Amino acid sequence: MSSEGFNPGPEAPQGQPALPNLQVVAQFIKDLSFENPGAAVNLTDRPQIELAVDLNASRLAEKDMFEVELKIRVDAKSDGRALFLLEVAYAGVFRLTNVPDIATQQMILLIQAPHMLFPFLRRIVADVVRDGGMPPLMIEPIDFLALYQARVAQGAGQPPQGTA
């Protein structure tokens, strides 16, 4: 098999601009809390699940490095009684190169980066809930593009100083 014509790096042929490149440097659980007051409850009905999602991106000190934090809060109740409360912040450190303007950086960091983190966070949520004695909670995929568009429409599209 020939590797001719294969370009593994972000460099582009001469005369053409380099393509944007988003690379995962690290991923980790930043914060995790699980409260399980309903562990002894025998579930016969499907619980009511409230899910909240929050997303932040910030520039790190090193050039082209950013931290993206995806937070999920799950509040499960049955007949008005709390079953469990799960809060998890899952973060990734990303290297983003060849994106000169802040608006495009922000779009990539708030759409593509969380899309890359989500499967890992989803597994953590399912495992923690299952280990708490409940059936695993499989979170539906999140439309990060729609979240980004809603954020921009609300005027939160401009990042605070020092973030992207």
Task: Give residue spans per PLM region.
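N-terminal intrinsically disordered, cationic/polar leader segments
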Residues: 2-116, 122-164
